[in-house]
Amino acid sequence: MYNTDVVIIGAGPVGLFAVFQAGMLGMKCHVIDAQEVIGGQCITLYPEKPIYDIPAYPKIAAEELIKQLELQAAPFNPIYHLNQQAIELNKQDDFFEIKTSKNTLIKGKVIIIAAGAGSFGPNKPPLANIEDFESKSVFYFINDKSKFAGKNIVIAGGGDSAVDWAIFLSDIANKIYLVHRRDKFTAAPESVRQLRHIAETDKIELVTGYQLNALDGNNAELQSVIVKDLHNNTRKLDANILLPFFGLKQDLGSLANWGLNVKHHHIEVDSSYYQTNIEGIYAIGDIAHYGGKLKLILTGFAEAASSLHHAYSRVFDGKALHFEYSTTKYGEKK
């Protein structure tokens, strides 16, 4: 049995920043994550993807962001319980007891749920025999962009992942086809602007009004992707690689059975301190839902700070928190 102040579920960027914030407030942390390494989707799905909206970083790779967040949290000696899920929750007086899938027991006064999309997997397009090409010609996640150098690539989707990867890979690919069933893209406006600028060259071709229809190839080697419009007109795109980006399937797993208010696979919280309907349990980052929610990493950072400042009196038995700036606090911790 471990005893701690705060149990953080999720070791993605928001969970890691929560470790730092808790440490600055004098709180000890244990962190639970289902993956074998810390970093969440940033490491598992897109370590090389550039992130542009982190303050003070004009551009930073997801993997590097996680490295910096881990370094920032390290002085506070968090204990990580990786490759295991939080499966059971029991309330005991002023404490919560969590049991993991490896039978680890952790007792804490506050729980911060920063589980991102929960357990995640790709939404796969309904194409015949697509599994024959997976991991060789069809990829749902990118962890090594160099394998796509000089390739003809079909990217399918209209959101941030599809648009961002089309831009990012355009420097190394021979040709990119971006297939989307609509004329408008739902990615960030600046990303769409960059996309359309590059599309004026031969590096990216926008194939709008079409959807994926079939794959053609042999021995897991893709030769072409067949797309179809609303009038059943087809077009063959010569391609070696297919990257379908249709979002993730979300699964809260055991968290859905903890008595929390859940809506559309997200945990509902108040918009002031991000506390759930159970006092002492907070949800932050992509897993949290409230009016006006923005699914951004930097928003999750702010939610981590607010929730832990609010949790201070619970952790320290009603003691009032006297606010100090980090320059003062960090000097005391050294």
UniProtKB/Swiss-Prot annotation:
Pfam families: Pyr_redox_2 (PF07992)
UniProt entry keywords in alphabetical sequence: FAD, Flavoprotein, NADP, Oxidoreductase
Binding site for FAD: 33, 41, 46, 86, 120, 286, 327
Residue ranges that the Swiss-Prot or TrEMBL entry lists as coiled coil: none
Domain of life from the UniProt record: Bacteria
Family: Belongs to the ferredoxin--NADP reductase type 2 family.
Protein name, UniProt field: Ferredoxin--NADP reductase
